[in-house]
Amino acid sequence: MAKRDFYEVLGVERGASEADLKKAYRRLAMKYHPDRNPGDKEAEDKFKEANEAYEVLSDASKRAAYDQYGHAGVDPNMGGGAGAGFGGASFSDIFGDVFSDFFGGGGARGGSRGGAQRGADLRYTLDLDLEEAVRGTTVTIRVPTLVGCKTCNGSGAKPGTTPVTCTTCGGIGQVRMQQGFFSVQQTCPRCHGTGKMISDPCGSCHGQGRVEEQKTLSVKVPAGVDTGDRIRLTGEGEAGSMGGPAGDLYVVVNVREHPIFQRDGKHLYCEVPISFADAALGGELEVPTLDGRVKLKIPESTQTGKLFRLRGKGVAPVRGGGAGDLMCKVVVETPVNLDKRQRELLEEFRKSLQSDTSHSPKASGWFEGMKRFFDDL
């Protein structure tokens, strides 16, 4: 099935800013994340689709290539990538439950013609609790990746031997093919763009120069991160081939849903249930914050839905600036499971209000409006 346009996937215009892209991705990531949709294959596919779109459009060079050439500009299998790896299957594809696409990757990318090639970038989704994201933390992760083979020091050749120059391309990694009136340059089909051939491969890596390994890494997460933020670990991606530099690892943050708070940028929101009596007479109650409990004064005649702002009780942004606010929305609860005496008291209270609508201004206005509506019919 043909891929959808990346801008369409994120629901943004082609000229969208970086902030708009991030906001759109964050919304989709929160909506379709597997933690929120266990067993939902469609949601999982949409989550991966959003990841792929964001990884391309959030990178200036990849976005430029995509804008000019479409999917072909960022697809290594359509002329933009480098040589094959592990029998044509990328290690990151093998571990697709942990990693999504390379950040523009194939077996390796960014390498020079015929020789050393940079390793692929990798992506790791890091799930955090809201408290961890707000305060910052250090976590240990295990990343399946490719590392340089120690037996052959990454050459792919059996110790004591060396790779030889490819006779098909003469060591440049590219060949020219005649197609009608046109001559096109393509990756050498024999050496896969490396410019070298291995006649006696290393027994440990089978000539690949790289082996599979679970790498354990410590990641320092700064305070204030949010869903969609990326932490770059330079050189922690896949090892390069033929002595090329390693790629990078991008740790993408996903903040789990919190049972009390909802986050919007640097502000937090929560609902606070209050009793009918406290709403009418006023009172004081404790509300939770990420720093502990605080007192909240409820004035008399408080209506459900009223917002109370606790300044500075939100989140300090990761890029600096003052902390946001905590917005508490009160919800007046109707009393239930009343005993006989409580029902009698409420009945007396109701009777006392029947002749005086000033105690319920909204209800009074509503009934007056309804009366005028029927009078006009």
From Swiss-Prot:
PROSITE patterns: DNAJ_1 (PS00636), DNAJ_2 (PS50076), ZF_CR (PS51188). Participates actively in the response to hyperosmotic and heat shock by preventing the aggregation of stress-denatured proteins and by disaggregating proteins, also in an autonomous, DnaK-independent fashion. Unfolded proteins bind initially to DnaJ; upon interaction with the DnaJ-bound protein, DnaK hydrolyzes its bound ATP, resulting in the formation of a stable complex. GrpE releases ADP from DnaK; ATP binding to DnaK triggers the release of the substrate protein, thus completing the reaction cycle. Keywords: Chaperone, Cytoplasm, DNA replication, Metal-binding, Repeat, Stress response, Zinc, Zinc-finger. A zinc finger (CR-type) spans 136-214. SMART domains: DnaJ (SM00271). Zn(2+) 1 binds at residues 149, 152, 202, 205. Its cofactor is Zn(2+). This is Chaperone protein DnaJ. Zn(2+) 2 binds at residues 166, 169, 188, 191. GO terms for molecular function: ATP binding; heat shock protein binding; unfolded protein binding; zinc ion binding. It comes from the Bacteria.
